Amino acid sequence: MREKKLLTHSEFQVMRILWNLPAQSGFTGEILARYEDPKPAYTTLATFLKILTNKGFVKFKKKGSKLFYTPTISQAEYADTFLSPVKDTFFHGSLQEMMRFFLRKENLSEGEVNDLIQLIHEVQGK
């Protein structure tokens, strides 16, 4: 099993772009094009990609003279790595307590509440 590692803010930005790229996109220039301004320098992005590769979050293939990057972990898998310890540490492992905390803290619209109720009904139907 992969050692659980957390991403820095800058690394997470790169991963978020990679998770949302179309399947045939993944060259450094394509990743850079997805950044909002201010964009990092090309060499800075290349450094982030090298770090992410070393951490095991990204793999690459050489295509011609360029490197093609793909994530090795899905966004959902990373979210679990990040959120499970929060649930365990702050909410004694209880998803119900974690949800209760956020539902009381957030000011949800009626539509958002209805969406959550619908989601609960979908889960109950499984």
Question: Predicted segment positions?
Answer:
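Short alpha-helical segments that sit at the start of domains
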Residues: 1-17, 126
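Short, cationic-aromatic polyanion-contact patches
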Residues: 8-10, 63-82
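Short, locally clustered residues in the helix-turn-helix/winged-helix DNA-binding domain
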Residues: 16-23, 36, 103
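Short acidic, hydrophobic short linear motifs in intrinsically disordered regions
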Residues: 24-34
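Short, hydrophobic-biased segments on the C-terminal half of alpha helices
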Residues: 46-50
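Glycine-centered, phosphate/nucleic-acid-interacting loop/turn motifs that mediate DNA/RNA or nucleotide
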Residues: 56
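Short beta-strand "wing" residues that participate in macromolecule-binding interfaces
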Residues: 59-60
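Amphipathic alpha-helical dimerization/coiled-coil segments
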Residues: 82-125
